[in-house]
């Protein structure tokens, strides 16, 4: 990222402090859930370092693989092992559940009403002639991004939703 020197140095110091605090949180926090979230902070700061060094594909891979998969797996394992400790004061329905339900339902309804009204022609469908001409001018990581955002957009989103639902279901089963 081409930033002026002072802003770049400030971001480096800020991310360095985030790494140090996250690392200390992983080691010093007594609750393993908080330690796992601190590890997620460390992974996010590392990916932001990659963005500052103009390695955008590596940063995206860092976020998807480490934060999105490894850290979630660690949190799932910790919740599965310590399930009896957290389910002692289990309430069937709380205020937070109601607020979450209202927010999720309103988001779902807004998406259902917005998606059919959106013109997807310019977003998804691109001409093959332009792709053939541009393939020599772009790198492999840009081609991966173009294919994920054009040809494989809907399957990519469906897979991410299926994985999210499976993760939530696994956490719900582990907590009972």
UniProtKB/Swiss-Prot annotation:
Its main location: plastid. GO terms for molecular function: NADH dehydrogenase (ubiquinone) activity; quinone binding. GO terms for cellular component: chloroplast thylakoid membrane. Its EC number is 7.1.1.-. InterPro entries: NAD(P)H-Q_Oxidoreduct_6, NADH_UbQ/plastoQ_OxRdtase_su6, Nuo/plastoQ_OxRdtase_6_NuoJ. Keywords: Chloroplast, Membrane, NAD, NADP, Plastid, Plastoquinone, Quinone, Thylakoid, Translocase, Transmembrane, Transmembrane helix, Transport. The chain crosses the membrane at residues 10-30, 32-52, 61-81, 92-112, 152-172. It is found in: Plastid, Chloroplast thylakoid membrane. Pfam families: Oxidored_q3 (PF00499). It catalyses: a plastoquinone + NADH + (n+1) H(+)(in) = a plastoquinol + NAD(+) + n H(+)(out); a plastoquinone + NADPH + (n+1) H(+)(in) = a plastoquinol + NADP(+) + n H(+)(out). It is a multi-pass membrane protein. It is an enzyme of class 7 (translocase). NDH is composed of at least 16 different subunits, 5 of which are encoded in the nucleus. NDH shuttles electrons from NAD(P)H:plastoquinone, via FMN and iron-sulfur (Fe-S) centers, to quinones in the photosynthetic chain and possibly in a chloroplast respiratory chain. The immediate electron acceptor for the enzyme in this species is believed to be plastoquinone. Couples the redox reaction to proton translocation, and thus conserves the redox energy in a proton gradient. Belongs to the complex I subunit 6 family. This is NAD(P)H-quinone oxidoreductase subunit 6, chloroplastic. It comes from Helianthus annuus (Common sunflower).
């Amino acid at each position: 990222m081409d930033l002026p020197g002072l802003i770049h140095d400030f971001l480096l110091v800020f991310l360095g402090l985030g790494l140090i605090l996250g690392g200390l949180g992983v080691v010093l926090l007594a609750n393993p859930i908080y330690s796992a979230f601190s590890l997620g902070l460390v992974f996010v700061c590392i990916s932001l370092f990659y963005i500052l060094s103009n390695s955008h594909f590596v940063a995206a891979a860092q976020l998807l693989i480490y934060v999105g998969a490894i850290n979630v797996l660690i949190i799932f394992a910790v919740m599965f092992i310590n399930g009896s400790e957290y389910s002692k004061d289990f309430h069937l329905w709380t205020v937070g559940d109601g607020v979450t339900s209202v927010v999720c339902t309103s988001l779902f309804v807004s998406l259902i009403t917005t998606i059919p009204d959106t013109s997807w022609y310019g977003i998804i469908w691109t001409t093959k002639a332009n792709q053939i001409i541009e393939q020599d001018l772009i790198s492999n990581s840009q081609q991966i991004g173009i294919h994920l955002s054009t040809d494989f957009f809907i399957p990519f989103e469906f897979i991410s939703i299926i994985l999210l639902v499976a993760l939530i279901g696994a956490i719900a089963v582990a907590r009972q």
